[in-house]
Amino acid sequence: MGNNELWLTTEYPQIVFENTEVGRLKKKIWDMSDGEIDAVLKKYDIPSLPEVGLADTYIQNTVRHKVIANRKKNDVVILPVGCTENHGMHTVSGLDTFMCSQIIEGVRRYTAKQGRAVNIAYNPLPYGAHPYHHMGMPGTIIIPQHVAVEYLVSVMAGLWNDGFRKQIYINNHGQLWVLEAAVHEFFYRYQVPAIIQVMDWHRAVREFFYPGVKGQVNTPFVHADESETSVGMLLFPEGMVDLSAAQEAYVKNYLPVGRFDNSTDSFHRPQRWSESEGHFPITLKGTPEGVVGAPASSTAAKAKRPIAAILEYLTLCVDQILDKFPAGTVPPAEEVTQRTAAELAPYLQEPQSPGWRSIYALPKTGL
């Protein structure tokens, strides 16, 4: 494939899409009119009220026999991951969680219309792990990283044990390294065939948060800013965003700007924001407002295209997994673990069927 076939270009030279199924999907959304974007959102019933207390939506609010029946049609489960963190005077400390839960609820609604509803489960980290610079900030509750990892591994194991062996964790908080560590620890410890994925949803559709392009946000995605507040205005119930209380604040950098990128890697800089500490003040001292950016310029319309993009991308993720591994099947045990197929056979049976064994009966492995 030549260079001209590798990339799908746009009217902005800094924004290109890879010529793959994913890239072509993103390019399609990029080229859509505002009316077409509204039609995508309508497919997913965006916006809608939160469904956490609505029967037959989350695993935890669906009666058991329905959970099992649905899993036999679609055994992918998506979980939102967030935190409790000060997001300024104008919005809520659960913003990261609610962004993710509203997104995955939309994916569930759309797949349910197709008769193959993806499973969704409650947020396993409602308080969250945090980077060092969050310490001491009122309104932010920090869980130690090792506790968060262990908690996530336990959730992964419990879901796997119940037949949910394809898991996707959608994150909107500065803790991706903790989620990645949990994935690897789960596989170290249990060595079972599974597909477990984590992603920062905003980074997954980063092109749609580039500042100053295509009627989108005008400032880089950071924290409680124009980007996050716009998403909240589109997705959240009335009263969870109050622009009249919005404040503007920015981080003081000790080093020249250009090395460390923002939350969505908008500038293609050499390093992610999370790859250093100490080169800027901690939040309590540097941005006590709980904001990095200019949330007062937020509008729900600015979030429509990125939300359409993540909804369609997550649907594609589910489709790709199930196309390769239909419900009840997993990757080849002897290719993705050091256990034998015979050893794992009882553990891979339908839970509670004759001969089935629980994941907790497996001989422990790991480092």
Model-derived segments and spans:
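Extended, histidine- and acidic-residue-enriched regions that form the cofactor-binding/catalytic faces
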Residues: 1-143, 150-166, 172-367
